[in-house]
């Protein structure tokens, strides 16, 4: 599965991969972002240490997309 460039999806500025939804505003990062909870479809979610003390999570594997494969 290939993911188009992030430029045309404003919510995916710092992503490794992004969802393919319409409208573009509905898109979310799949890999590489820190989120309060992992996305639906994230099959491997890892807690990330943050300085703020609030727990954040990052997705390591999203459905069929392996974030570490890049």
From Swiss-Prot:
Q: List the disulfide bonds.
A: 12-31, 18-29, 38-45, 42-59
Which InterPro entries does this chain map to?
Bowman-Birk_prot_inh, Prot_inh_BBI
Keywords attached to this Swiss-Prot or TrEMBL record, sorted alphabetically, are: Disulfide bond, Protease inhibitor, Serine protease inhibitor
Keyword set includes Nucleus: no
Q: Name one GO biological process term.
A: negative regulation of endopeptidase activity
Q: Which SUPFAM superfamilies match?
A: Bowman-Birk inhibitor, BBI (SSF57247)
* Family statement drawn from the similarity comment of this UniProt entry: Belongs to the Bowman-Birk serine protease inhibitor family.
Tell me the function of this protein.
Answer: Serine protease inhibitor. Strongly inhibits trypsin (Ki = 7.1 nM) and almost completely inhibits elastase. Also inhibits chymotrypsin (Ki = 19 nM). Does not inhibit bacterial subtilisin.
Name under which the protein is recorded: Bowman-Birk type proteinase inhibitor A7
